[in-house]
Amino acid sequence: MSLSTQQLAAQKNLSYVLAEKLAQRILKGEYAAGSILPGEMELGDLFGVSRTAVREAVKTLAAKGMLLPRPRIGTRVMPRSHWNFLDKELIAWWMTKDNFSHVVEEFLIMRNSLEPQACALAAINSNEQQRTRLAQLMTQMTELQTAFDRQRWIEVDMAYHELIYEMSGNPFMTSFANLFRSIYYNYFTAITDNEVIKLDLHQAIVDAITHGEEQAAFDACLALLKEPVAHR
């Protein structure tokens, strides 16, 4: 790798780190919506980076709807209604320890709206291979009841729900599961204790999908999502 290429890669890394730092400040309200960010030189001095790194960081956040650069005016912080919360990096920056509960709350509202419909669609659109795979995952979940492995349960549970979105046959729903994988993982990790979770309701979804019962699949998923997780 040539020196110029190394420098370019280092510059790119610096701009990403700066974009994350600026995003965190914006998310915390330190740079409020409607305010103008400090200029390139001031930000460069503040974070110890070049003006090029600042410009690239601003471009990154502008692409996510967080900033709006304007000549002779400066870079304005945009209101949250303009932010692209479907951006994986923005989700990761938002989902800090302090924000986790709020992010999950917002995520579950979206999940509760989509996943029952995904189950209903899976009952009518899935193929035999997908249904077989879902049954296999259900078997693995059942086996974990007698020999529980927390990390393995999280992996299988995630695979189960991701597969249902795929089985729906709707590309937007499949993308939803892929996009929010990090939130799913952190959420399932948070709610999983030392035992299987709602095994009967997971089975009810599998049974309904297997038999092509659209409404039953929808209702079973709704029951799964609405029943609170009990910890012992």
Each predicted region: which residue ranges?
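C-terminal all-alpha effector/ligand-binding and dimerization domain
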Residues: 135-138, 142, 147, 155-156, ...
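Residue-level recognition of specific faces of alpha-helices
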Residues: 79, 106, 133, 176-179
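Inter-domain helical "communication" segments and dimerization helices
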Residues: 85-91, 95-101, 129, 150-152, ...
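A generic short alpha-helical patch detector that favors 3-5-residue windows
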Residues: 10, 14, 106-110, 129, ...
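Short linear motifs at protein or domain termini
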Residues: 1-113, 120
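Alpha-helix boundary/capping and short turn/kink residues
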Residues: 31, 112, 124-131, 147-150, ...
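Hydrophobic, amphipathic alpha-helical faces that serve as interaction scaffolds
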Residues: 86, 92-100, 110-126, 139-143, ...
